[in-house]
A protein has these predicted regions:
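The feature encodes the CheY-like receiver
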Residues: 56
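Acidic catalytic/metal-coordinating carboxylates
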Residues: 33, 59-62
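Short amphipathic alpha-helix used as the core "switch/output" element in two-component signaling
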Residues: 61-72
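Two-component/phosphorelay signaling modules centered on CheY-like receiver
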Residues: 11-29
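Alpha4 helix (beta4-alpha4-beta5 surface) of REC/receiver domains from two-component response regulators
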Residues: 62, 82-100, 104-108
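Acidic, metal-coordinating helix/loop segments flanking the phosphotransfer/catalytic sites
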Residues: 30-48
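Active-site residues of response regulator receiver
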Residues: 52
Length: 116
């Protein structure tokens, strides 16, 4: 079973994501704070990390940079409402596996990336 770490400042979106992933047979741990998610990922159980760019305690780019310093290289997918091209290019440069806009059909796009 895939274990997904999801971090986003929106409680509504965390619940929505957890429900979606559960329906797909995945275990999901949700966090509001990036620091808590980094600690969970460092435990080594995560198959994927799904993150927004607005977190309760840090920005999404800072969170991604922190993840990249961990010894395990867990794939990261960004699900965001931001469509700023410069910001999205910076995320690609940080090595994210995929960027999905919340305004689009994010469930279908996420399913393709996760292969579910």
């Amino acid at each position: 079973m895939k274990h997904v770490i999801h971090v986003d400042n929106s409680e509504f979106f965390r619940k929505l994501m957890k429900s979606f992933l559960s329906e797909k047979g995945m275990e999901c741990e949700s966090f509001e704070k990036g620091e808590d998610a980094v600690n969970a990922v460092s435990g080594g159980r995560a198959s994927f990390v799904i993150t927004g760019l607005s977190l309760a305690d840090m920005g999404g780019e800072e969170f991604l940079k922190r993840l990249m310093t961990l010894p395990q290289k867990t794939p990261v997918i960004v699900v965001t409402s931001s469509d700023e091209i410069k910001k999205l290019k910076r995320l690609e440069a940080l090595g994210v596996k995929g960027i999905i806009l919340k305004s689009g059909d994010w469930k279908t796009e996420l399913g393709k990336i996760l292969r579910v």
